[in-house]
Amino acid sequence: MYPAHLLVLLAVCVSLLGASDIPPQPLNLVQFSNMIQCANHGRRPTSNYMDYGCYCGKGGSGTPVDELDRCCKIHDDCYGEAEKSQKCAPYWTWYTWKCGSDGPQCDDSKTGCQRFVCDCDATAAKCFAKAPYNKENYNIKTRCQ
């Protein structure tokens, strides 16, 4: 084998090892984002929910600060139930749904994890659409204990 080939092979191996440390993006967050847009008819960007209150976004602790934050806590709890009782990986579960006139609708033919996770997301998206958005509750994680 030529030294140049060995260098290329070594570079590929090193890059693959480095890439294994990068956590992949959960697949169904794209679906959840689309559901949120469906439910609120595009009135509020999905990014507004990424760091809202004590429960919207990654993790959660303390007491929900308002109705919208309660929607996020309920969604977190629903995902916890999906993991516990359904043995699902909710962040990785891909499901089918459609955007109807009354918001997101899960595919009735699905059962088990797909249906459970879809219902978690659809319920949360509809809850988000109904709840008022208080700008003062954006990026307040330091207040959540």
Curated annotation (Swiss-Prot):
It holds the Pfam family Phospholip_A2_1. Its cofactor is Ca(2+). Ca(2+) binds at Y55, G57, G59, D76. Residues 1-19 form the signal peptide. The active site is at H75, D121. Keywords: Calcium, Disulfide bond, Hemostasis impairing toxin, Hydrolase, Lipid degradation, Lipid metabolism, Metal-binding, Platelet aggregation inhibiting toxin, Secreted, Signal, Toxin. Disulfide bonds join C38-C99, C54-C144, C56-C72, C71-C127, C78-C120, C88-C113, C106-C118. Its EC number is 3.1.1.4. InterPro entries: PLipase_A2, PLipase_A2_Asp_AS, PLipase_A2_dom, PLipase_A2_dom_sf, PLipase_A2_His_AS. It is an enzyme of class 3 (hydrolase). Binds 1 Ca(2+) ion. It is found in: Secreted. Transmembrane segments: none annotated. This is Basic phospholipase A2 S2-22. Gene3D superfamilies: Phospholipase A2 domain (1.20.90.10). One of its GO terms (molecular function) is calcium ion binding. Snake venom phospholipase A2 (PLA2) that inhibits collagen-induced platelet aggregation. PLA2 catalyzes the calcium-dependent hydrolysis of the 2-acyl groups in 3-sn-phosphoglycerides. Expressed by the venom gland. Residues 20-27 form a propeptide. It catalyses: a 1,2-diacyl-sn-glycero-3-phosphocholine + H2O = a 1-acyl-sn-glycero-3-phosphocholine + a fatty acid + H(+). GO terms for cellular component: extracellular region. Belongs to the phospholipase A2 family. Group I subfamily. D49 sub-subfamily. GO terms for biological process: arachidonate secretion; lipid catabolic process; phospholipid metabolic process.
